[in-house]
Amino acid sequence: EPIDLLGKVFVFSKESNVDDVKLLTPQTE
């Protein structure tokens, strides 16, 4: 269920820093 995780991280990125998402999901970029 990688999509679920990505979606959750993406939403979190909006509330948190985008840098966190880049570190958590470097594949997205």
From Swiss-Prot:
- Residue intervals passing through the bilayer: none
Q: Which organism is it from?
A: Hippoglossus hippoglossus
A GO term for molecular function: carbohydrate binding
Determine if Metal-binding is one of this entry's keywords: yes
State the GO CC annotations: extracellular region
Would you tell me the protein name for this molecule? Answer: Serum amyloid P-component
- How would you summarize the oligomeric state and partners of this protein? Homopentamer. Pentraxin (or pentaxin) have a discoid arrangement of 5 non-covalently bound subunits.
Location(s), subcellular: Secreted
Task: Return the cofactor note field.
Answer: Binds 2 calcium ions per subunit.
Q: Where is the Pentraxin (PTX) domain?
A: 6-29
The main location is: secreted
What are the alphabetically sorted keywords of the record?
Amyloid, Calcium, Lectin, Metal-binding, Secreted
Q: Which family does the UniProt entry place this protein in?
A: Belongs to the pentraxin family.
Q: Which cofactor does it need?
A: Ca(2+)
InterPro entries membership: Pentraxin-related
